[in-house]
């Protein structure tokens, strides 16, 4: 049974921890399909430093996440280059093998979705059975092909109230 890896990336929004709660809830409901859920401390940088924490499959421990702003696991704005030009993918591959990762969940905005896309192409090129999924969140509302994303509404509300 493969394990899952979740990472937060980009600017912390009022909803990024809510997304993490949703991931934990999905994990708890699918422990027959997912062995362990790991969270990377400080996004992709945590993966590169092997700085992962195991998230327990006990939803009651994480109830506060639904209402907690910020990024509890920390975040990163590190951008990966193209796989053929960036040797950091080798380290990411080593970590994925070490933890028997079958699913990588990248929570963030435009740059984070770019990272998810690059990771997906990298693992596909290696013919690795690793599913990479982007979980959109952005205060900028700059993800193409979307009307709006989680994080945008709360950012607009905050700015509007701040200038009134």
Would you name each region that the model predicts?
Residues 9-11, 40-45, 77-78, 109-110, ...:
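Short, ordered loop/turn segments at secondary-structure junctions
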């Amino acid at each position: 049974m493969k394990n899952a890896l979740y990472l937060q990336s980009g600017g912390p929004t009022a909803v990024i921890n809510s997304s993490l709660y949703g991931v934990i809830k999905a994990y708890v409901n699918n422990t027959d399909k997912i062995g362990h859920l790991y969270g990377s401390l400080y996004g992709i940088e945590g993966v590169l430093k092997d700085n992962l924490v195991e998230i327990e499959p006990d939803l009651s421990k994480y109830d506060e996440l639904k209402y907690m702003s910020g990024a509890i696991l920390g975040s990163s704005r590190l951008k990966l280059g193209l796989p053929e030009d960036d040797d950091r993918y080798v380290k990411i591959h080593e970590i994925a093998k070490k933890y028997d990762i079958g699913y990588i969940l990248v929570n963030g905005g435009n740059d984070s979705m770019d990272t998810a896309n690059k990771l997906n192409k990298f693992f596909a090129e290696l013919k690795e059975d690793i599913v990479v999924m982007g979980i959109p969140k952005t205060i900028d509302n700059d993800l193409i092909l979307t009307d709006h994303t989680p994080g945008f509404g709360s950012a607009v509300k905050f700015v509007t109230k701040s200038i009134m």
